[in-house]
C-alpha cells in the first residue's frame, strides 16, 4: 500500500493524503509536492487503442481497452463506433453494454465507460474520410437504426454525429436533441446550414477543421457557425498533425472553455507501426500518422490525451486551459459530474510535472504506470 502526501491541485487546493494500492505488501509513503494533481482525462471520441477497436463488437476487447486506458491518464471515455451497417452497429452496442455491466463487478483499475457514440452512418459521402461509404444511410434509415439500438440497449447511446445539410437532418435534430448530444461532423455544411443546426438543438462540432468545409474569409463554414453559437462545443484532435499548432492556439483563444480535446484514436494507438483495420478499411500507422487509400489521407489518429496535454502546453497554451479541455469540458458536454478530485474510496487522478508530462496515475484507488511512448 502506498500513501501519497503533500498533494496539490492545479487550482492551488491542498488535497488530503491518498492511499493507493501499488501491488506491494509493504506500506510506504511518497511525497507528491513536485507534481500537480489533475482530474483523470476524459476522451469523448475514441475508437480504440492497444490493438482493440470498439467497432469489432467484442465485449472482452472493450473491457481490455477500458483497463488499458488509465495508462494514458484516462479515467472515463465514450467508445465511438465507425460508420457500420445495422447488424454491426447493434452487435457493437451490445458489446459495449455488456462491458459496462461486467466492469461493475471489477475491483481494479479501469476507465469508466460513459455510453456509446455513433459517428455515422448519417454522414456526407463527400467528407466521409475513412468512414465506409457503402454503409452510409438516409435519414429515415438512420432513425430506424437509432430506435432499434435504443430499444435493445436503453440509455446506452449518448452522442450522435450527423451532416446537417442532408435531407431530413433537421428533423433528426428536433427528434433527438433532448435525448442525445448531436454533433456536426463529416459534413459539407455551409455557415447558414450549420447555424440552423446549432439554433435547432445541435451543440457540438466533430474534430474541428477536419472532414468539413474549411473556414474561409467569406465562407466561414461550420467553424464560424460554432463560434457564433455560444452554447456549442468544439472538439479538436491535438496530435500536431490534424491541426497545425498555430491554428490550435487560435482555437483555444477564440473558443476558450468550449474546446474539447479528443484523440479520435484507432486500434493502432499504443502499438507498433503496421497495417491495422479500422471499420473494415486497412489503415497504415507509420511514424505517429495514420494513412489510407492511394492519396495517403489521414485516418483517425494514434495519439492519446496524455500526449495531447504535453503537446498543447509546449505550443504555448496555458496549462489550466489544457487541463479543462481534457477533463471538465468533455464531461460537461455529456452532463457528467467530474468527481475525480473529490477523494472517496476509489479516487481517480493524474500527477503531472511542470510541462504537463504524466508522471503517475491513480485509477480507482490503484497506482498505474503511465504509458510514456511519446
Please name every model-derived segment.
Residues 48-60, 81, 131-137, 181-185:
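Active-site mouth loops of central-metabolism enzymes
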Residues 118-120, 125-221:
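Divalent metal-binding pocket/active-site signature
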Residues 9-17, 318-323, 332-364, 370-371:
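Acidic, glycine-enriched loop/beta-strand segments at the rims
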Residues 47, 63-92, 110-124, 153-167, ...:
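Divalent metal-dependent hydrolysis catalytic cores, especially in the metallo-beta-lactamase
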Residues 172, 193-326, 333-337, 351-357:
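Active-site-adjacent C-terminal substructures of enzyme catalytic domains
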Residues 7, 34, 45, 69, ...:
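Divalent metal-coordination and catalytic microenvironments
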Residues 58-61, 92-95, 218-223:
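Charged helix-capping and loop-helix junction motifs
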Amino acid at each position: 500500500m502506498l500513501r501519497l502526501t503533500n498533494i496539490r491541485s492545479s487550482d492551488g487546493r491542498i488535497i488530503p493524503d491518498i492511499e493507493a494500492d501499488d501491488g506491494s505488501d509493504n506500506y510506504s509513503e511518497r511525497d507528491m509536492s513536485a507534481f500537480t494533481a489533475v482530474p483523470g482525462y476524459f476522451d469523448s471520441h475514441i475508437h480504440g487503442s492497444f490493438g482493440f477497436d470498439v467497432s469489432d463488437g467484442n465485449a472482452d476487447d472493450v473491457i481490455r481497452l477500458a483497463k488499458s486506458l488509465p495508462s494514458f491518464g484516462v479515467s472515463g471515455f465514450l467508445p465511438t463506433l465507425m460508420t457500420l451497417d445495422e447488424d454491426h452497429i447493434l452487435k457493437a452496442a451490445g458489446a459495449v453494454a455488456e462491458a459496462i455491466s461486467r466492469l461493475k463487478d471489477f475491483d481494479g483499475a479501469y476507465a469508466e465507460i460513459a455510453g456509446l457514440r455513433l459517428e455515422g452512418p448519417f454522414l456526407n459521402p463527400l467528407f466521409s474520410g475513412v468512414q465506409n461509404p457503402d454503409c452510409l444511410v438516409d435519414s429515415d434509415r438512420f432513425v430506424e437504426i437509432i430506435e432499434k439500438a435504443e430499444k435493445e440497449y436503453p440509455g446506452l447511446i449518448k452522442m450522435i454525429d450527423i451532416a446537417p445539410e442532408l435531407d431530413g437532418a433537421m428533423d433528426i435534430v428536433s427528434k433527438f436533441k433532448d435525448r442525445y448530444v448531436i454533433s456536426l461532423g463529416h459534413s459539407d455544411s455551409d455557415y447558414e446550414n450549420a447555424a440552423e443546426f446549432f439554433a435547432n438543438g445541435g451543440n457540438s462540432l466533430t474534430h474541428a477543421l477536419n472532414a468539413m468545409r474549411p473556414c474561409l474569409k467569406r465562407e466561414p463554414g461550420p467553424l464560424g457557425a460554432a463560434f457564433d453559437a455560444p452554447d456549442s462545443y468544439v472538439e479538436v484532435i491535438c496530435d500536431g498533425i490534424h491541426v497545425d499548432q498555430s491554428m490550435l492556439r487560435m482555437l483555444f483563444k477564440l473558443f476558450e472553455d468550449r474546446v474539447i480535446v479528443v484523440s479520435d484514436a484507432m486500434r493502432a494507438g499504443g502499438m507498433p507501426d503496421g497495417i491495422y483495420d479500422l471499420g473494415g478499411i486497412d489503415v497504415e500507422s507509420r511514424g505517429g500518422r495514420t494513412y489510407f487509400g492511394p492519396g495517403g489521407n489521414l485516418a483517425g489518429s494514434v495519439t492519446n490525451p496524455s500526449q495531447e496535454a504535453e503537446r498543447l502546453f509546449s505550443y504555448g497554451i496555458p496549462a489550466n486551459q489544457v487541463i479543462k479541455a481534457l477533463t471538465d469540458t468533455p464531461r460537461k458536454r455529456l452532463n457528467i459530474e467530474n468527481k475525480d478530485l473529490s477523494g472517496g474510496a476509489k479516487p481517480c487522478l493524474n500527477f503531472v510535472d511542470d510541462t504537463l508530462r504524466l508522471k503517475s496515475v491513480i485509477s480507482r484507488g490503484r497506482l498505474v504506470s503511465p504509458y510514456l511512448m511519446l
